[in-house]
Amino acid sequence: MNDNAFTFQTLHPETIMDALFEQGIMVDSGLTPLNSYENRVYQFQDEDRRRFVVKFYRPERWSVDQIREEHQFALELVKDEVPVAAPLAFNGQTLLAHQGYHYAIFPSVGGRQFEADNIDQMEAVGRYLGRLHQTGRKRPFTFRPDIGLAEYLFEPRQVFEDAALIPSGQKAAFLKATDTLLSAVTECWRTDFATLRLHGDCHAGNILWRDGPLFVDLDDARNGPAIQDLWMLLNGDKAEQRMQLETIIEAYEEVSEFDTAEIGLIEPLRAMRLVYYLAWLIRRWGDPAFPKNFPWLTGEDYWQRQTTTFIEQTKILHEPPLQLTPMY
């Protein structure tokens, strides 16, 4: 069974509690599901009133070696005093198994939502991203992939071609817009950037604030350019994004060098994320959680909007990239 066909319907509460009991943890509260579609994540409290989070990984998405690399990276970051949510070890192992599922247990870490429009918080995030990347540069991932065109563009293009859920009246226009976008990204893409281990999905929703930033969810960690962990923090118009990026880079460079030439990768990376995310939704459609939570995916209007989004992103790729002020 591949990861596209898999569902979590056999992951019952009793199965979860049995898995935790095997590690010496008695659940003394209910299992509260947290927002995660790719995996299944639950918060709970044990009999000593300690709070934990347990994460059950979607089978076949990542190999055991790839998940262990993610965990090792998180533990390295903690050792280097970078604030991340890292898995706990049981008998020396962070990746655990029960009834065919792989899972990990984390301490439950509370915090407020990171405020992307707060300049002080943005500076702190930039500084800690510099430290995170210092650790990331020590060595690359061996088993986890690099960010590249095949995974983020060409494989999704085939998913779109094969997808039965795209309305027939919209498919031709959508595929045409996709092909035009892919060509534009390919023209802009560079492979001469330095790569390092990244958080990979560093947006505001994966940063908590507790007297400073706390990075969570390294599930998408990959090798790639440093800018991948910066651009998703930007929002607003170009002037606002320029100010935000300058704030991040200035703080980042207090602890780590940043190649400003990578700024030209922001819009190609944005396009790649748009394409990859849409293909991900289609791939996961067999999981009942997806039709339930994304019912609009089969609608004509939705695919019209996606076609327009791809056309607009293609236009942006033909414009000059974001420019920093001359002091940079």
From Swiss-Prot:
Keywords assigned: ATP-binding, Cytoplasm, Kinase, Magnesium, Metal-binding, Nucleotide-binding, Phosphoprotein, Serine/threonine-protein kinase, Stress response, Transferase
EC number per UniProt: 2.7.11.1
Task: Enumerate the SUPFAM superfamilies for this protein.
Answer: Protein kinase-like (PK-like) (SSF56112)
The record's InterPro entries line, in alphabetical order, gives: Aminoglycoside_PTrfase, Kinase-like_dom_sf, SrkA/RdoA
Q: What happens when the gene is disrupted?
A: Decreases long-term survival (1000-fold decrease after 20 days in liquid culture), derepresses curli production under non-curli-inducing growth conditions.
Entry GO terms, CC: cytoplasm
Q: Where does Mg(2+) bind?
A: N206, D217
Q: Where is this site: ATP?
A: S36
Functional note:
A protein kinase that (auto)phosphorylates on Ser and Thr residues, probably involved in the extracytoplasmic stress response. Probably acts to suppress the effects of stress linked to accumulation of reactive oxygen species.
- Protein name, per record: Serine/threonine protein kinase RdoA
The induction text for this entry reads: Expression is growth phase dependent and sensitive to the media conditions reaching high levels in stationary phase (at protein level). It is probably regulated by the CpxRA two-component regulatory system.
Identify which cofactors the protein needs according to its UniProt entry.
Mg(2+)
Q: Matching Gene3D superfamilies, A to Z? A: 1.20.1270.170, 3.30.200.70, Transferase(Phosphotransferase) domain 1
Enzyme group, top EC level?
transferase
